[in-house]
């Protein structure tokens, strides 16, 4: 959370040197933490507070946790609790983390996007079971609601044969296009890899070398025995254990 606050207030790790386009839920959570030093749990049971902010930043968790989907799911829930503690946000992040880890481990699109029964009930469980496959361009939603973003991203990747096609389809859904694109990009990148990204796109990425170096560092850090430390130090309630 302190890192998030530094990004918000001082622009740390922002390519422009300042925070921009921060979501409402994230801003409120960071404001509360900056004031109290505690996680406030804003909007835990409010479906109107179930935004996509914790889903769009998930890739580093999957890189660190690879190739263990259970570790990835646990860390994904914990990172969501910091700013988006709603149960549906945690569930969406946990499910998506599993997809990312399987793809990073070499799973192809059909394997990663297979119908699943993960014990999740409700909307996230329906997506896991393949409900997105029946959607059309006219019926898919690309709003800022975490479930809509999750489904739209998976739908775009599932209907595409390469990274470029998936991203163009995702962002052209409109709505919360940048976040839907970010989520689709995580999954498409994990499935098709760096080589699947058009070189002309890679050339335009700000801080490209820095991002690539940190991605590799996360993968290497995840291989160490101390990888489980973040889980061991934090209980299921989200509080640090003594």
Name the predicted role of every residue range.
Residues 1-242:
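Structured, active/binding-site neighborhoods that engage oxygen-rich ligands
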């Amino acid at each position: 959370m302190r890192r998030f606050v530094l990004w918000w207030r001082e622009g740390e790790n922002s390519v422009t040197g300042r925070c921009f386009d921060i979501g409402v839920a994230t801003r409120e959570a960071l404001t509360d933490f900056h004031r109290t030093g505690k996680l406030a749990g804003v909007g835990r049971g409010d479906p109107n507070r179930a935004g996509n902010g914790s889903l769009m930043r998930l890739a580093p968790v999957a890189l660190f946790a690879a190739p263990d989907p259970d570790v990835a799911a646990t860390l994904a829930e914990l990172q969501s609790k910091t700013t988006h503690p709603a149960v549906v946000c945690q569930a969406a992040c946990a499910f998506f983390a599993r997809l990312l880890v399987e793809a990073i481990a070499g799973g192809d699109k059909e394997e990663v996007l297979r119908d699943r029964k993960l014990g999740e009930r409700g909307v996230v469980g329906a997506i896991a079971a393949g409900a997105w496959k029946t959607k059309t361009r006219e019926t898919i939603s690309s709003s800022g609601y975490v479930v809509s973003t999750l489904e739209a991203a998976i739908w775009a990747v599932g209907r595409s044969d390469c990274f470029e096609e998936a991203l163009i389809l995702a962002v052209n859904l409109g709505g919360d296009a940048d976040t839907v694109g970010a989520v689709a990009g995580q999954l498409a990148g994990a499935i098709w890899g760096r080589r699947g990204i058009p070189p002309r796109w890679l050339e335009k990425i700000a801080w490209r070398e820095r991002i690539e170096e940190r991605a590799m560092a996360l993968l290497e850090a995840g291989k160490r025995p101390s990888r489980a430390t973040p889980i061991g130090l934090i209980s299921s309630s989200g509080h640090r254990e003594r």
